[in-house]
Curated annotation (Swiss-Prot):
Assigned EC number: 2.7.7.108
Cofactor binding note of this UniProt entry: Binds 2 Mg(2+) per subunit.
Catalytic activity: L-tyrosyl-[protein] + ATP = O-(5'-adenylyl)-L-tyrosyl-[protein] + diphosphate; O-(5'-adenylyl)-L-tyrosyl-[protein] + ATP = O-[5'-(adenylyl-(5'->3')-adenylyl)]-L-tyrosyl-[protein] + diphosphate; O-[5'-(adenylyl-(5'->3')-adenylyl)]-L-tyrosyl-[protein] + ATP = O-[5'-(adenylyl-(5'->3')-adenylyl-(5'->3')-adenylyl)]-L-tyrosyl-[protein] + diphosphate
The protein's role, per its UniProt record: Antitoxin component of a type VII toxin-antitoxin (TA) system. Upon overexpression in situ or in E.coli neutralizes the effect of cognate toxin HepT. Neutralization is mostly due to tri-AMPylation of toxin by this enzyme. Successively tri-AMPylates HepT on 'Tyr-104'. Binds its own promoter, probably repressing its expression. The TA system confers plasmid stability in E.coli.
Keyword Cell inner membrane: no
Family the UniProt entry places it in: Belongs to the MntA antitoxin family.
Subunit structure: Forms a complex with cognate toxin HepT, may form a homodimer by itself. Forms a heterooctamer with cognate toxin HEPN with stoichiometry HepT(6):MntA(2). The 2 MNT subunits do not contact each other in the heterooctamer, each contacts 3 HEPN subunits, blocking access to the toxin active site.
Annotated motif GSX(10)DXD motif, positions: 27-41
Leading EC class: transferase
Name of the protein described by the UniProt record: Protein adenylyltransferase MntA
Induction: Expressed during exponential growth, part of the mntA-hepT operon. Under autocontrol by MntA.
Ranges annotated as spanning the membrane: none
Pfam family, one: Polbeta
């Protein structure tokens, strides 16, 4: 298994994404748990949302340059849960500390709000399930 060339990732992304703000490595490579068949998970934040076709083409360029499958995520269009995973478990490869901190605070705030909303739904489901079980109804 080859060593990951972070400089190659940074250069290719900076050369191809206008107004790029942040680059993160996440998944198995950021945790040091990659294996022979692992893909490379990369997340980017730019001033504007990336076009899906352009993002796919860029992922293919990265895959060719790195000789590995690449999953390229645009954080502007990613789910709150995925953004939270990138911020809390990923490794920042490029960008300013200020941009990283602002994105992290925004993401964690949105994630906490989502968790609060989910909790109300979970509580309702649990209450309905318990009531059905108490009445002997099938779940």
């Amino acid at each position: 298994m080859q060593q990951l060339n972070e400089n190659k990732i940074i250069k290719l992304l900076r050369d191809n994404i206008p107004k790029l703000q942040l680059i993160y490595l996440f998944g198995s490579y950021s945790q040091g748990t990659q294996h022979r068949n692992s893909d490379i998970d990369i997340a980017v934040l730019a001033a504007d949302t990336l076009d899906n076709i352009a993002r796919w083409e860029l992922a293919q360029k990265l895959a060719s340059a790195l000789d590995s499958d690449v999953d390229l995520v645009d954080l502007r269009s990613a789910s709150t849960v995925l953004c939270q995973q990138v911020v809390t478990q990923g490794k920042q490869l490029w960008g300013t500390q200020q941009d990283d901190e602002l994105f992290a605070v925004k993401t964690i705030s949105m994630y906490q709000h989502l968790q609060a909303e989910r909790q109300a739904i979970i509580d309702d489901v649990m209450a309905n399930t318990a009531a059905k079980a108490h009445r002997g109804e099938s779940l």
